[in-house]
Structure formats: C-alpha cells, structure tokens
C-alpha cells in the first residue's frame, strides 16, 4: 500500500525492504537510490551449518513483457521515475565477454580481472560508495585487453588504457562516463557523482599503474620485492581479509617464480573461480 505523498518508486523500495526484514535472519538494511543494501552478519547454526557474513544490493525489477527479454524497469528514488535495466543481456554479454578472453592459469581473464579490480577497490577505498563495484566492472569491460597472456599484463593493460583516455585526472572538466556491461543499453554511466570523486579514482589508477609497472620490472631481479610492491596495490596479509601472496622469504628461493603459484589461499585475489 502506497503512503500519502510517496512516489511509486519509493513505495516499491520500502516494500522490498520490509519483505527482506521478514525473512527471519538478522540483517541491517538500508534504502539506496535504486536498491536495498543488506548487511548480513555471520550466523552460527549447528543444525543447518554456519552462514558467513554477506553484503548484498537487492534491486527490485518490474517485468513489463517477458522475463527473458530486455529492457525491464527499476525504480529510481531520486529521479522519481522508472528507468530501463538490461539484466538478461548484462549476464549474457558478460559470459560472452569472459569466454572470448584469454585463459590465464586456467581462468578466463575478463571476470578474474573484474574480481581483482574490485579487490583493489576494497583495499584503497574501503566501504566508500565511490567507485561502485558495478562501475569498475563496466570499466574493465570497456578497457581490458582480452588477449593479455599474464595477470600482470592484464592489470597493466587495463590501467594503461584507462590512463591513456584520462591522462590528467586533476584537469578533468567533466565526470567521465562508461558503457554499461550490456551491449543493448545505449546509455552511458558516470563513474562518480562529483568531479572530485572521479579525479580521486583516476589518480589512484594512475598511481597503481606506476606501482604495477615497477613490480614487473623488479620481478626480473627480485621476485620477493616485486610481490611486496604488488601488496601495496592489492593488499597484504591481514589487510581487510585480502592479500597478494608473497614467495618464500628464503634468500635462496626469492627469485623462484613457481613459489608464488604454490602459495595459494582463498583470499588470493588472483584465484577467481571459473565463470560462465
């Protein structure tokens, strides 16, 4: 039931929030512009098994014609209107894009790179809203090199392509926009709400590019030091549960390239699961 003076869009989000809160699991919910953000704490359940902490953005979608066809509608609380969304083509185009990228260490590189850049965001921006994870995925889709043969080159090529298009973040006079991951969506999406936020994101990408290039050069003579540099970009042990793994510290093994591959962990940002 819509409240007095409440828009249809605000009503849909409010009812979605109430439905989530009735699920029975303790959750902290917050209404965003187009979604409901849900923070689920870890839950100890000796019968059904423990449930891990989880953060979700739940977007209610209205299906005007057919659930298999785009576009659909989502509520925009700030604009007070319905906006098109393309969930089917977003998924299908992402799968195609991923499978058309080179495999590196057994993984298609596109989706793995998305996970790495989202980990990068967590290290440098924490829980800040900017840059949004979806925006970073759009940026990877637009600027990645699907032919990259090695992870370090996949990261360098992505960052280099971004920096080539935006060589002077401090001189920006407008907020850059990127294409949606859906090839059907004709609209572009701003990478931030303000020019200052956009400059901050792009400056961090410029800095990261410099560091990753330095790490690649350093790896030719000192693999351990190269990994330490990459930890500045992708996190170190104990840093927000993310890490770039170090090779063995033994001087006789510091230049052993294979040692990095052997030191895998569930928090290794390079170990994205298979996709598609």
Sequence positions of predicted segments:
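Conserved catalytic core of two-metal-ion nucleotidyltransferases
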Residues: 4, 9-69
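Hydrophobic, mid-to-C-terminal alpha-helical segments
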Residues: 124-176
